[in-house]
Design a protein with these regions (language model features):
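Long, low-complexity, charged/polar intrinsically disordered regions in eukaryotic proteins
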Residues: 1-7
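Short glycine/proline-enriched coil/turn segments at helix->beta-strand junctions
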Residues: 39-41, 76-79
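DNA major-groove recognition helices of helix-turn-helix
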Residues: 14, 29-33, 48-49, 65-76, ...
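Short, Lys/Arg-enriched N-terminal segment that forms or immediately precedes the first helix
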Residues: 8-21
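Short capping segments at the starts of secondary-structure elements
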Residues: 35-48
Length: 146
């Protein structure tokens, strides 16, 4: 069973069994997969078509969605539940999503202020706490550092 890995914090990178997933027919096809994995639940085809192809007529948008779904079916078919009126990402299939790791760590509220604070903390990190700093004959202090 193929495991998909989604690294979306920063430049998007998607892997299937530890290899880059390639073969997307368009950026919008890739965006559709990203939207589905980040947005649990069933999504109507009309909503998805409007999400990505709102500048087209309804018929053109639905046709573009069909084409993108056909492409995704070939790339990650078992991970998608594609029905006549709705599409969903199957949560019971193996996948890893970096955004979920952050949400689980910091809570589901990732507003701009929280993200800014995470960026600040990341910029401050220069290495392990007191890396290379040693105090001789103070084993309790050294244990505390660890």
């Amino acid at each position: 069973m193929t495991t998909l890995r989604f690294r979306l914090l920063g430049e998007p990178h998607i892997e299937a069994d530890q290899r880059p997933l390639t073969g997307f027919i368009s950026t919008k096809a890739q965006a559709l997969l990203i939207y589905l994995v980040m947005s649990p639940g069933r999504h109507s085809r009309n909503r998805l078509a409007n999400l990505l192809w709102s500048e087209f007529t309804d018929d053109q948008a639905r046709n573009n969605l069909r084409t993108a779904l056909s492409n995704l079916r070939g790339l990650v078919g078992p991970h998608l539940d594609i029905e006549r009126d709705a599409v969903a990402y199957k949560r019971d299939m193996p996948f890893w999503l970096d955004v979920n790791v952050v949400r689980d760590t910091f809570g589901s509220r990732l507003d701009k202020q929280v993200i800014s604070r995470i960026d600040e903390a990341t910029a401050l990190y220069q290495g392990d706490l007191l890396d290379g700093f040693q105090v001789r004959n103070a084993p309790i202090y050294e244990d505390w550092i660890l």
